[in-house]
Amino acid sequence: MTNMNLKHKIFIMLLLVFCSSKIIAQQSQPNVLVFYVDDLRAELGCYGSKTAITPNIDKLATEGVQFNKAYVQQAICAPSRMSTLTGLRPETLGIYSIFTPLRSVHKDVVSVPQLFKENGYKTVSIGKVYHHGTDDKNQWTNYFTKEPNTYNKPENIALLEQFKKEGKKANGPAFENADVADEAYKDGRAAKYAVETLKKLKNDKFIMFVGFSKPHLPFNAPKKYWDLYDKNNFEIPERKKPENMYRLALTNWGELKGYHGIPNDVEYLDDNLTRDLIHGYHASISYVDAQVGKVMEALEALGLRKNTTVIFMSDHGYKIGEYGAWCKHSNEEIDVRVPLIVSRETSYKGRVAGKTSDALVENVDIFPTLVELCGLEGPKTDGKSILQVIDRPNTPWDQVATAVYARGKNIMGCTATDGEWRYTEWRDAKTQDILGAELYEHKNSLLSFKNLSGNTKYKKEEARMKGLLETQFPRNQGPFLQHDTPRN
């Protein structure tokens, strides 16, 4: 055999090995199913809620790893979702409001659907995934748009018709409990679309995002989910605000006040309306829980669970009367801490189930995690893969998680947590001058009622947390990047 023939044979053998390994790698790439829920704090049975009835999400937690200290990068829908889907923080993207679509500013940023589509995956978007439905619409091979809110009670339909005749741009009521089927409201339809799409894709490699709109306002859910709860059993949250908090730390919850029947000239809602809204929030959570159950049941029945990693997550937390406030829109612990459950495909030999982790993880970590999980080559991101924590929940991890919340274009709130303490600086967005600081202790509660910044007793804690904050937000970095489009 000549040297030339030997080299040729070796080349062919190496090529076959390479191609075979690539085929095996592609065959072992898991599918991904992501439940992306709107406005959901960790008000779930598996997270210790004494009130929420969530058997399907609780079951999912027993099948994977439940992260107790997961955080978003901004407590508002659009920037948070952009951060998840690009792996870039809001301060990197320069988008802090709901009025600026991602692609109106960033044409070349690589996103989750874009990367996975380029790598042969069927990419599916159902319901609210991005806040702006136009973002990356062409990167989804299957796209079911975010539907508008639905009202089913005749009196509410008539009310909206009246508003339309009068030329009023007004929202309907803040909650509804019509005695209708799940599909009469949009999240029931989202679950239906998800099940139908899974049947069509059972022989394909896919990544599917199912975006459930509840428990976002309005709290519209079928009556049977309201009937799970007795309104009078809900306790009224502590309404007092933290002592010495920064003047702009909380908003005036204008989002809720924009709904019909909500007074806009009061500091606090009365107990009766407060309980109605808390009731609606819980009914909406149980409604979403039932939809999660339907999709998971289909995943099992179709034989797809064995090769599908499932992620359950939220875009930010929420206040239902705590601090006398409502909705999100802050740097408070209750608004930036979120539920996160990850359950590996059942065929994975190293799969961990029924475990919790106190590792500090962030939604910005999801994209690089998916990249590693599926063996892809991804773009540079601000987040980092948490796959090793998913496989080994006690792995020592990050010391800090950070977030921002802008108050207009001139003031930026930047915040850091180590899982027990939260330190926030309110800065001039251009000069980085500190306008105010807050230090709160959260060892045992999402709520804290005294700003300890400047208290000599906690000088060491404040100095340490300030140092952690400045690792992400150095004072000498120059102005915060700003690409927000003015509201029309």
From Swiss-Prot:
Which residues does UniProt assign to the signal peptide? 1-25
Q: Describe the family membership recorded for this protein in Swiss-Prot or TrEMBL.
A: Belongs to the sulfatase family.
Task: Give the Enzyme Commission number.
Answer: 3.1.6.-
Per its record, what are the GO molecular function terms? iduronate-2-sulfatase activity; metal ion binding
Q: Where in the cell is it found?
A: Periplasm
* Inducing stimuli: By ulvan and rhamnose.
Where along the chain is the active site annotated?
77 (nucleophile), 131
Residue positions where 3-oxoalanine (Cys) is found in the record: 77
Q: Is tRNA-binding one of the keywords UniProt gives this record?
A: no
Q: Which UniProt keywords apply?
A: Calcium, Hydrolase, Metal-binding, Periplasm, Signal
Q: How is the cofactor bound?
A: Binds 1 Ca(2+) ion per subunit.
What's its job?
Answer: Sulfatase involved in ulvan degradation. Ulvan is the main polysaccharide component of the Ulvales (green seaweed) cell wall. It is composed of disaccharide building blocks comprising 3-sulfated rhamnose (Rha3S) linked to D-glucuronic acid (GlcA), L-iduronic acid (IduA), or D-xylose (Xyl). The sulfatase is most active on ulvan polymers, particularly on xylose-rich ulvan. It can desulfate oligosaccharides containing the motif Rha3S-Xyl2S-Rha3S and thus likely proceeds in an endolytic mode of action, removing sulfates from xylose residues in periplasmic oligosaccharides.
Query: CDD domains, alphabetically?
Result: iduronate-2-sulfatase
Please give the GO cellular component terms listed in this UniProt entry: cytoplasm; periplasmic space
> What name is this protein filed under?
Ulvan-active sulfatase
Cofactor(s) needed by this chain: Ca(2+)
Q: Which Pfam families match?
A: Sulfatase
Q: How is it modified after translation?
A: The conversion to 3-oxoalanine (also known as C-formylglycine, FGly), of a serine or cysteine residue in prokaryotes and of a cysteine residue in eukaryotes, is critical for catalytic activity. This post-translational modification is severely defective in multiple sulfatase deficiency (MSD).
Which positions are annotated as binding Ca(2+)? 38-39, 77, 315-316
The primary location reported for this protein is: periplasm
- Native organism is Formosa agariphila (strain DSM 15362 / KCTC 12365 / LMG 23005 / KMM 3901 / M-2Alg 35-1)
